[in-house]
Amino acid sequence: MKRKTFTLTLIAMMLCLPLAAQMSSADMFAHRYGDKWLRLRMHRDHSYTAGVAIKGQSSVGTTQVGDLTALGEQWCLVGTPEAFKMYNRATGKGQALAVSETSEGATATMVKARKATLWTLVDKGGAYAIVPVEGTRLSLNAFGGKGFDLKLYTADDEGGWWSPEAVGRKTVTLSVKVDGKGWEPKPRIAEMNMSVGGMRSSTRITGDLSKQTYYFPEGATRFSLHSITYRGYTFVGFEHGKGNLVASITDAELTDKLHIKAHYAPNDWRTLYYTPDAKGFPYRIPAIATAPNGHIFAISDNRPCYMDIGYGEVDIKCRISTDHGESWSDEFFVADGKGGDTNVMTTGFGDAAIVADSESNRLLVMMVCGRTVCWNGRWTPAKTATDNAVNRVARVYATYNESTRAWEWTEPVEVTNDIYPLFLDAKGQPTVSSLFIGSGKICQSRVVKKGDYYRLYCSVWTRDGGNRVIYSDDFGGSWTVLGTVADRPAPSGDEPKVEELPDGTVVLSSRKGAGRYFNLFTFKDNTFTAGTWGVAASSNDVPDGLSFGANSTNGEIMLVRAIRKADGVKCDLMLQSVPAGNGRRDVAIYYKEMTYNADGTNLYTPITFSQGWAKGIQVSDRGSAYSTMAMQKDGRVGFLYEEEPGGYCIVYAPLTIEEITSGAYAVAP
């Protein structure tokens, strides 16, 4: 297949930088441009360096995250400690650093070398201040960290103290080969972590053609190299010297002008949302659904405020696949938050829960909205549409237009006052003051149909007595509490999900540390209007109960029809996704073969439902968190989850039942 060579784009950072012994001033200076190169590491925070960035028509001195590949972070100091000019490797010998005046706040820029400032070095005992010869009271200062201009400030401030480090002659040049064609034109392929001594530099591999060179500190003799690969690509190995490809390079000898080639191959997983995005914003909170026409919807928060609803602008984005997850549309807004807009409801939208109607090409997306953090919500019947103290709820519909072959989306409509009043007690007093619907998959019944639609079930987080469940028989137009207002199906539950058993019994699965809270609602009769909740079971406290690492994280529960491959018998499998690790990492899918009474009715209690789970596929081998899933029309499970690098990207994985169960089961036809 065709091979492509990709560049290592200059998006990199150095971490954990140990400070070497102070470099003597005599060793820092060159007689002419290019004789000697230095990195100037910020003494107060060694991960930052002094560098040069192009801003408009000017090259400006800036504070940068240290990068072993960056020419703009290498300086040549020509002269003596008492009077020298500062040349930068990226701008060449024709320019040097200057300030237009020696006053506080003056910005350092690159100018013609003959007009550049003469600088002098001031020893600060373990570091140096760099000050203009004409005024030794002010020094070059980092002024706030990454991306901030270098400016003059008092030489007594440690933000203007620098620790020089000589750049050696030994280099490593890295190139990348991808066997085959990826699914998008400019993908992120990997984050390449280079370590030398105690220094680590992470560089992003993207889709531009070229090579990248690493410049190591003087005296470096050993190095390590490791690829953190974005999903959608498989890391094949490093070509290093002679012999077979290797998975990583650890403590290898650093020789002069070493060349390494990294090999990758595309696969059928997809990173749908990269964190950070082009504007530096993160993505979080996945939701996924499959419509009757086979279209798959992958939804995520995009967070310009960098945090949850209540802290500013949050948007909900969507991508659609029409070919079972092979390719995806560009992302678009389902709900566009306005940030500081005067309309409280439109400040932000997030934590989407989605369902595609099983019979019509119609979607419902429920979401939290507004500008209140959930823990601070204070709803009462008297609260108005402009009150900040309410954690609000909104709804969006989408319908497929057969003529245009396009999905038509409504604007978000606030339904706060359709939901909260459901939880008023007999005296008209609120039993819930703050709530949101658990993100991910809204459960649609396979059993209960009243009118045009099969019933929907939504599980609800509240700050008042844990979880509740509500249902709708008109596809989200109106809602009813499942059970009674007094019911507390999971009093200590966090973010919840629901699923339905074949007899109509409703299963609640709620987030908790090291396990799940499980409970079941049993209907009184086949009118499916009244029934009772059991007592919630903490699965990791039950003998043989579902348990995993010490983390508390949102996950998904889903029932699928399967075939037991050992004997070909059809059965139901319950799937539960959650991180398996200690902390938010190693997202996995657990499964449980379901059994029923002879008449097909439920035989489980919350305790027995908690038992008998097996660990299936471990989807992730790194930091990973929230997850959700939906059946696709091709019989695979569309699995959408959060995973490193970059905080959390949103990753789509099409999984077969065989993969999930290590070959024990297959999907039923």
Regions found by a protein language model. Give the residues of each.
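Asp-box/BNR beta-propeller blade signature and adjacent active/binding-site loops
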Residues: 267-669
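Conserved "repeat-terminator" motif of extracellular CCP/Sushi domains
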Residues: 169-171, 176-178, 228, 247-266
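A recurrent domain-boundary module in secreted/ectodomain proteins
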Residues: 150-169, 260-264, 653-669
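Extracellular, modular beta-sheet/disulfide-rich ectodomains of secreted and cell-surface proteins
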Residues: 170-217, 243-245
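Surface-exposed interfaces of beta-sheet-rich extracellular modules
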Residues: 220-248
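Bacterial N-terminal signal peptides
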Residues: 9-18
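Lectin-like carbohydrate-binding module/patch detector with strong preference for beta-trefoil
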Residues: 22-169
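Bacterial N-terminal signal peptides that target proteins for export
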Residues: 1-9
